[in-house]
């Protein structure tokens, strides 16, 4: 971006400010920058500048208003913000601006004296757009105007002026502290601080906190919005009470950043005193001097940084502990009050946490000037806020709307950020004290004020710092000047942090600002909605930068920084994040230099993008540093963090949120990274004159191009592939985990793995939950905007990703970018969140970043002389991809893989959005995880510590979510292997299986073996690659778990080669979404070696043909062989077994289970392969998988070898796996039942092993039972094989008549014979032996003895019964044929005794084999009859259910005839015995009565039935008689009427009237009785005289019922019912006695009725027949009583 025009005269500091500034100048000496004396001078100059700024503050307010009105472009807007409003102010402001420019020029000249200053100056140019944005925001108030003026002047003049501006800001703050300014201090002061700080920081971050400050600025904006919400910004929020106050509109800037800004500008302008404008002008004028002073002070601060840092860290730890004990809300409130009343104090606290060096310098300044400390503290606050604001401004600049509207909201944001970020900036300044000399001094002052605000004995703390201030400054300067980095692990010289190898790719000119502005649409929107989130993010960045600085600092500095971090974490972890940028730059000469230069370059390339990127990077770096330093300082920082977390869960949550925001920012950075990568790939790296770099770059480019062409996942992927070329270079053992490709990230190699492990794992959850935190803390859920802003930052920052050697966390802007995108998605603020939009934006950023390449080239030129090129330095030159595969290269590959995972996550960002809904409690837990991760990361700084931390990070990863890691790992592996193939690296990198495995192990040994390693698969590089996609924070960065050796190598690699060679950072992503990216970036990242399998086209190469397998969430290729591809299965199994890797063996188990569950074994199945697989599984102690395979094998009728079974038992016994015994016993029994044969010694051995493992008695008994079964089976097999010998024995038994022995022989054969045909053959032989072949006469029946022996067998079964029944049938036919009824009877009796139902069986031999059931029953019944057993015959009939001929049991007509004859015979025999019921049963089952198929005439059975009926009547068996009569009538069997009449009479006399009436009615229908006669006038009943009285009565009943209607009618009383007793027509000569008897029976019939009937004799007719009449009254009475039942019986038929 072009530098902003010089500040207008309106910016000139006011008179009051001038006075203050003069005082300060007097207080300070001219030489404060170089020593104590110079420091004092610098302070004086700063005070003078501040006075000038204070004078210009009134003008700034107007300028702010004007700026908020007019802002069309990023640069124009910023310029307008600064120029227009200020231009509208008085000319004094212009003079102040000119003065500031001059001071800035002077400061720039001084800076150019040192390379670091140059870098800083270069970076200061970039963040101007952000500065403008911040200025707009700060213009809202007079103080903000002052800040804006200073910032503008700094942006124009350079870093020096930026420093001066900070001083001016501090002075302005002091001036603002004046009563009129105090009135608006909540808003105006804060805004001014933020504005001023933003401008200063925007310019400053370029050289001092380049990366950090932009991020800090953005963070400050977010902090302003989220100060209330961010738990980790407690301290900052406390200091940022101004945003909390009604005046502080920062809290809601995210929602309506433009509106709020405007409103804030208005309100602030109104609130700010008119004097603020002149103060600002004065400040502007003094800006130049202030800048110089600041630079000098920065030098002094750097020199004293180390000492002060140690003190600050200790104090900070104490403070963090105390603050953690204090309630989050209370601390925030207290800090807010302090921020309002004691901006100095707040500033000090912030700087105290922000930058140790700055704090120390500030402390010295405080010693020099207490009042100055107050003024400086505001200035520091402004600086911090400016850092935060710069980031925020960058974000706002990135947001087009924010560019024009930022003025007031940005001011509020800055104000809020100032307080919120102050602690963070302090720590950041401390960490970045080298680059921020002026900031260091100002921050020192701020630190002083912070002390007071901290409430800890900060005075003591500052005193300690004061004592070591000068030393720290010297050390900081030495660090600045230091061009080499010392790596104890490798002993190699280190490269300056601003080295060309590390900065060129990171540095971006202002042109990169448009890149960030590409994000601006979404970022701006995000900013509006999520300014609070920005604030949180800024705090998070501060925390990150704090962490980075701490890690980079020496152990002493680290301790102090950790203390400060604790304090800052307690107060505002987010501020620490903002500070992280500075810290990263300042901590170690190497890391600091790299970071510093990178941040500066980034600032140059685009202050907005760089600032955002820096902010994001700072978040991650800072968080990483926190985690890393915390890890190092387990005693201090870890404890403090834990204390802070436990004491204040909200604070812990805040810190966690900050960390997450940090990552989010990193994701944003990653978003921009593709552009940066493109630029680097396009030409910057080519300009580097490092051996092998170009070649590697070209090679990587080719690979990336291939992978991108082959896997056209997204433009992001293509960009990442472009960067992947360099990534491969880095991967070839140039440990530069930070890759210009796609997401260039800040990675701390040494600590990267563990730090990542911890922070990533922590961030995994937190990234998702951070937005929930932000959502809860900031109702607007602004993190998305904040993240998008960071994304913008990342575009520049990404290129400038910083790598902190000692910092545990590898900063992956891409990853953070993804997270930020995710938040944007959730917030829906960042509308173009889609991957395509993101890609487009990235492309734009890339092109814009490309514009900023000259800065990188310049940085390269500047640093090329400082680089000691070691020909054998693998960090710089790397190792060829094909040749050497060192741990470093493996690590690099791993770090590259994460980019692919990042892509996946970006693709799945929707899925990741859900984590945003996490509860604050989750965030708190995540915070604790973060602490652990940070400790781990710090430990990673050293190789030994790295391994330990790796384990810790593993735990963290596990706690975060192993499943996601696993999924991501699998997907990553699969996609990676595909990329290898796509990039045609199969041939180059194709090794033997073992070599491939080893290489894979070096790269991802932990990945394959542990879930943590799976997390490691998901790397931030992948996230970076996917960063363009709106993958939200959900793209968690799981910790990278590497072996100690790998970690060590990684650390060394980072240290030796920090340059941006296109390598991806080592941060890994835990979410499955990252797997997708991870897969896509496999070409750029770790290349999976092909296993050399020849697979069909449809099969997934990654799943089958790579060690790590397929990791796609939804892979379109086949993962399980299809039917008919069993040969492929066998080949895969053989290959996996040959490689003998755990992950491959487990995959083989899965393939085996999936395939053979669906398809049975085929011709290609190889039992040896199965056995080998089981052996391999046992060697790896995969007993569960062994059981699975064996169980499935048994189901598909495949038995492993006996040796395998014994090996399993041995393994269980050796390992004392008591719990596995039940399952193993069950498998053993199944195998025995399936046919496995064991020798007795095998059984004994197994039982012995079971005793060793202390198996239960039941389990051992089961094994013994299986031995018995096996023995029986063996016996059966023996008999089966010796059937001939059994037949011989049968003959022997026959000859000797030993039928009992024959029965035993039968049992043995039955047990040993397995084929039914053989068994039936043997049984047939027995039947023949028992029948035909036995012709001896005698009472003995062989069958009976044989059946007796067989039936006594305890294992007698239905089979035995069937065999005996069939043999018995053969014997029956045999004896029936021979008419040997007695022997046949014995056979039948034996069958009856044994309850063998032979009637349903057939014989074994001869015609009986085809005999029908009717025939068999007939034979048996006949035998019974012939033997005199009638009951036996009936039993046989009943046993056969009287079946004759049925469809189921058909028979011949002969059989039917035989049955008829047999039944008739039985019936006669039964009747003879008067067994009427049995006789009737037999007669009922005669042929013809059962079914229609029997065409037999039933009339022929009349004689039998009438005989039976007569016999029954005579015997008075009325029941049977009645049944027989009914059956005969129903079956139409002719019945004798005499028998029927006798039956009716008998029934009537027996009072069985119902049956009597029924039979009478049936007889009447048959014509047994005459029909009724009569007419209408006369009713006549003819009763034969031969009827009995019963029959007569029944006839009268019918007569009365038939005429009931006429009888009962009223008019028929005269009608007469006549009865004529007829004489027998056939017997005319009937005697009178008989007739007279008939008359008496008639009278008796009338009397029998109930009620009685009365008859009267009327006359004798011509035939001498008596005529009687029924009395009418008696008939009426009878009908009345009996008509109901009588009508039913007589009037209705029974059928």
UniProtKB/Swiss-Prot annotation:
What are the Basic residues biased-composition ranges?
43-52
Composition-biased stretches (Polar residues): 735-753
Top-level taxon of origin: Eukaryota
Q: Which GO terms describe its biological process?
A: cell differentiation; spermatocyte division
Keywords assigned: Cytoplasm, Differentiation, Spermatogenesis
- Its main subcellular localisation, reduced to a broad class, is cytoplasm
Which Pfam families does its entry note?
Asp_Glu_race_2 (PF14669)
Q: Region Disordered: what ranges?
A: 1-128, 441-474, 725-753
Span-the-membrane segments of this chain are none
Keyword Nucleotidyltransferase part of the UniProt annotation: no
Question: GO CC terms on record?
Answer: cytosol
- Tell me, what does this protein do in biology? Important for normal spermatogenesis and male fertility. Specifically required for progression to the post-meiotic stages of spermatocyte development. Seems to be necessary for normal expression levels of a number of testis-expressed gene transcripts, although its role in this process is unclear.
Q: This protein is called what?
A: Protein TOPAZ1
**Which source organism does the UniProt entry give?**
Callithrix jacchus
Gene (UniProt): TOPAZ1
